Amino acid sequence: MDIEVSRIISELYMNGDLLKESSCKCKNNTSVFLDDSSIDRVNCQRNNYKLQLNRVRLEYKSGKKKNDGIIINLPPEQIEGLTKESASKTIKALGTDVTFNYNDETTTCIVCSKEVQEIVVSLISLYYCHPIEILQKFCNKNNQLEVILKSQRRPFENIGSRINLHVKANDVIEFIKLANTEHSHIHDLPRYVRQYIDSFVVSEPQRFNMLFAMASSFAEYILEKGKMGGAQLVEETISYFNNIESLQKVKDTIVKANLRRNGKSISTITELRNECEHNLYSNESYEFFANNPSVNVFMYDIACKIVMKLAGIPTLSDTI
């Protein structure tokens, strides 16, 4: 099948029709669809083109049914030492059964209902503070097995996370069990978790901006405070988590730094955000956060409470 598919894909690419409702049928009752694909990379050797696609959908005509599931870039050893020889691990979580199976040394298969797949992945990402990716997704559809293959962006790294310092969970399984999906904003969790995790791989000025945006968005969309200004929205979020006293300490830190913009003193986190946006890569921005790490620690604590709130997981205390 690989040679046949490769030839058809190459011909479609040369004709400029690769991503225009492309599909091909193979001899073993398999159909390959590229309508949702995009090209990550193209390698050319003479007349042969090797394409790396970010997404491919397969459909198998088969009388056998397979439970809905996904394969993620999490080594199975992270699931209580799951191995090829060991039995699968099934837990009761998120109102359903979630089963973890060994796939290979670097990936784990999770069998659960489609409704909670992204939530499970987000919780695992949150626990490890690392973007967990869905590499394969399979489900039964119209008496066919549909499989979606996705390219991997980053290998798994167990870099540790402060998030597990705030909950009674010794491992990722316990962490997932603590989650509560019975609230109206549970499907917002993946978006906020991505923002939270992404904030760890940028500069400190960028991080401040991202965490500020998280706090603003939480007030506007989750607390439903409406179209306020950014400063008001962030203060609504901070007030919601009872951190007003800590906010005043951050304001005092900003005032003591004697930062100025257009001749005016910077004294609030909103004014600091505006300065960071306009002078993101300035020496002043880097020096401020290097000399005053408590500012981003405060913003991180608010972001941490946001994602924990959306996950339905109570923290060990009201103060992080």
Give short role names for the model-derived ranges.
Residues 255-289:
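Histidine-centered, metal-coordinating catalytic motifs and their short helical/loop contexts
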